[in-house]
Design a protein with these regions (language model features):
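An active-site-proximal structural segment forming one wall of the substrate-binding cleft
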Residues: 196-210
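Aromatic/hydrophobic pocket-lining residues that form the small-molecule binding cavity
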Residues: 140, 164, 199, 203
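Aromatic-lined substrate-binding rim segments of carbohydrate-active enzymes
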Residues: 144-196
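Conserved helix-loop functional segments at active or binding sites
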Residues: 130-133, 184, 208
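Secreted/periplasmic carbohydrate-active enzymes, especially glycoside hydrolases
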Residues: 1-154, 158, 162, 173
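A generic secondary-structure signal for well-formed alpha-helical elements
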Residues: 84, 175-178, 210
């Protein structure tokens, strides 16, 4: 791949009771970009950085993220910072991989493709990390490393039981795809959520995060 077009989308929220104006800046690898942002009192919005306005987002010769066994799961350092009056209001540092995922259902069979190559998901279900919910970064790091050492390429986050960032960070690092369930055991035959609003909020949070 000689070029990848990035389109960062960042959710920002003004927790103050008055409008604010600031600058949202981002960095992915060596690429930097920024734009002014206006927020009404208590407003939440999605700020989009589009390559038509920021041509530097057309990354040349990107190092791609590949699943375990298909190549190196390369990750870029990323940062997003929001400034008010030239002072940092909030910022987030994380790592991000560049990859393209596609699928089709030819002959009623689900086929997955990563960066144009056919991908075979091999792995198993993960429910709770363990019964006392004591897993943190070190434990997830070890468990997912074992997953990769067994030549697995995917795990299913069964019924969305795990929401820890450390799990997703470890999967990014070791090239493990995540089949993310929503918070339902059997959507076709129930039971339906007792609290639909909570369920929808949980689903939106997962979509925004991963």
């Amino acid at each position: 791949t000689t070029q990848a077009t990035l389109t960062p989308e960042i959710i920002v929220k003004n927790h103050a009771g008055n409008p604010v104006e600031g600058v949202l800046s981002g960095k992915v690898g060596d690429i930097t970009f920024e734009q002014p942002v206006k927020l009404a009192a208590n407003e939440e919005k999605t700020v989009v950085f589009d390559a038509t306005q920021f041509p530097q987002l057309k990354m040349k010769n990107p190092r791609l993220w590949w699943p375990n066994g298909y190549g190196t799961p390369h990750l870029y350092d990323a940062n997003f910072t929001f400034r008010l009056n030239n002072e940092i209001s909030d910022q987030k540092d994380f790592k991000v991989g560049i990859r393209q995922m596609d699928f089709d259902e030819k002959n009623h069979v689900l086929n997955l493709y990563i960066n144009g190559r056919r991908f075979i998901g091999m792995g198993g279900n993960w429910g709770f990390s363990e019964s006392n919910l004591n897993y943190r970064g070190r434990e997830y790091e070890t468990a997912v490393a074992y997953h990769a050492a067994m030549n697995f390429t995917m795990m299913r986050n069964w019924v969305g039981m795990i929401g820890d960032e450390e799990l997703y960070d470890a999967c990014d690092k070791y090239g493990i795809m995540v089949w993310q369930d929503f918070w339902l055991a059997n959507p076709a035959d129930g039971p339906d959520p007792y609290y639909p609003d909570m369920f929808i909020a949980n689903a939106k949070d997962y979509v925004n995060r991963i």
